[in-house]
């Protein structure tokens, strides 16, 4: 397999991994520690991820409990969660922070599905851009006589197969997330 095919596979996988991360950040009405990904707390002047400052547990389906290792950081963590606009209200008793995840309304579920579809479409575009770049590189190599026309055709077919597989994977992830959001 050529370097271009391997590179194409790697780039397409990165697009799928990125999609998975983005979908994990979308709450489906259940408590999930991924909800706090990307929330940074001002801890002694340095932005620090919540996961490094506290243990996060999910004792109930709609409840997230954050137990800071350093009790003095409770206020800062609460402030960072409020600033992140996650659509949740943290409540604190001075030692732990509880986040009650509200049940999603039908309207909000449909909004989230729209967001998921947009994110999915962006991922498909990223995969197709990788395909285009790879095919351009293959054509350039053929033009420079680095590969034969048969090799070009074979490798272009390989790139298309990788693209088809990646698009199927994206669609599978989207369908799973949509079902997750729409299930009550």
UniProtKB/Swiss-Prot annotation:
Its main location: cytoplasm. GO terms for biological process: translational termination. The keyword Acetylation does not apply. It comes from the Bacteria. Residues 133-153 are annotated as: Disordered. It is found in: Cytoplasm. Responsible for the release of ribosomes from messenger RNA at the termination of protein biosynthesis. May increase the efficiency of translation by recycling ribosomes from one round of translation to another. HAMAP family: RRF (MF_00040). This is Ribosome-recycling factor. It comes from Staphylococcus saprophyticus subsp. saprophyticus (strain ATCC 15305 / DSM 20229 / NCIMB 8711 / NCTC 7292 / S-41).
């Amino acid at each position: 397999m050529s370097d271009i095919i391997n590179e194409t596979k790697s780039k397409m996988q990165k697009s799928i991994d990125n999609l998975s991360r983005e979908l994990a950040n979308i709450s489906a009405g259940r408590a999930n520690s991924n909800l706090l990904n990307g929330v940074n707390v001002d801890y002694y002047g340095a932005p620090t991820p919540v996961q490094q400052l506290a243990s996060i547990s999910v004792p109930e389906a709609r409840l997230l409990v954050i137990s800071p290792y350093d009790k003095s950081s409770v206020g800062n963590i609460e402030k960072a969660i409020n600033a992140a606009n996650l659509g949740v209200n943290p409540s604190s008793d001075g030692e732990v922070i509880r986040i009650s995840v509200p049940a999603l309304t039908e309207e909000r579920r449909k909004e989230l599905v729209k967001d998921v579809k947009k994110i999915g479409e962006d991922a498909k575009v990223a995969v197709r851009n990788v395909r285009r770049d790879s095919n351009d590189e293959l054509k350039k190599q053929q033009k420079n006589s680095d590969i034969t026309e048969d090799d070009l055709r074979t490798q272009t077919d390989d790139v298309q197969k990788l693209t088809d597989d990646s698009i199927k994977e994206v669609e599978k992830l989207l369908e799973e997330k949509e079902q997750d959001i729409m299930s009550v």
